[in-house]
Structures are given as C-alpha cells and as structure tokens.
Amino acid sequence: MSETLLLQTAKLIVDYGLKDLGYHYVILDDCWSAGRDASAGNSLIANSTKFPNGMAAVADNLHALGLGFGMYSSAGKYTCGGYAGSQGFETVDANTFASWGVDYLKYDNCYNKGQAGNQLLSYTRRVSTASFWELVTNCPRYETMAKALNETGRPILYSLCNW
C-alpha cells in the first residue's frame, strides 16, 4: 500500500460512481506505520516512503473527493503485522488520528497480552443480561480507545475487530 495507490483507488471509487451508490470510507489497513516518534510525545508516524506527504495530506485529498478517511490500529502492543499498536497509547493515538483528519478507525485485537475477546464483546457496556455484563467488564481496552476518540472532539466512527 502507498499514498499513490490509495488515492488512485479513491479516485476510481468516485469515477466509477461507487461514491454515489453509498461507498464513503477509504480505509487504510495495517502496515502504514514507521513506529513512534519519542520526540513528539510517542505519536505514531507514517512510513514516509509509502506516504511521503503524510496522513493529513491523504485525508485532505480524500475529503476533497467527498470520501471519508479510515485508519487502522490494534488494541495490543503491536498490530497484526507487527507494527506499533495502541495499547498504552490510546490518548496519544486518538489525538494523532484526529489531527490527521481521520473519520473512521478499524481497531484490531492483536498482541493484546492474552486479553482475548469473545463474540458477545461490546465496548459500549450496554447489556441486557447479567452474564453478558460479566463478559464485557473484562475488556477495558476497547472502552479506553472509545473514550480517547470521543475526547478528541472529532467524530470518528469506531469499528472493532475481535480476534
């Protein structure tokens, strides 16, 4: 994946009329990161070879096409591809995503120190039974990122991937 390929694909979504049919988000999955910048509060940084203009420029270009920009991270120490995950950096990462103009976050569940989820997991803590409540109280990592995203003031659609 690269900035060029992502933006070419986005343009095709518009040119082929898919945007008019309801396609809105262009989501960049794993392997976009170059790690964290310790001199900038440990914020995530994009791979400058793949994304030479940076993520804010990618978002600006997608928004100019009338599309939303989706990013990827993981609730663990690493992403599934072995890049820097958000565990312990939720507030930093949420603020970074918001500053880039991200509209959607796919949040995976790799390298989470054994904090496996289950098919009934919900970060909202809205429950209908006591047994379900017991299941969701063991998974604060999703709620931590949800809170961090909400505190940015930018509306970011939050999508959970529960491996």
Regions found by a protein language model. Name each.
Residues 5-115, 129-135:
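Aromatic-lined carbohydrate-binding/catalytic grooves of carbohydrate-active enzymes
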Residues 1:
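An acidic-aromatic substrate-binding cleft motif
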Residues 11-15, 121-129, 133-163:
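Substrate-binding and catalytic surfaces of secreted/luminal carbohydrate-active proteins
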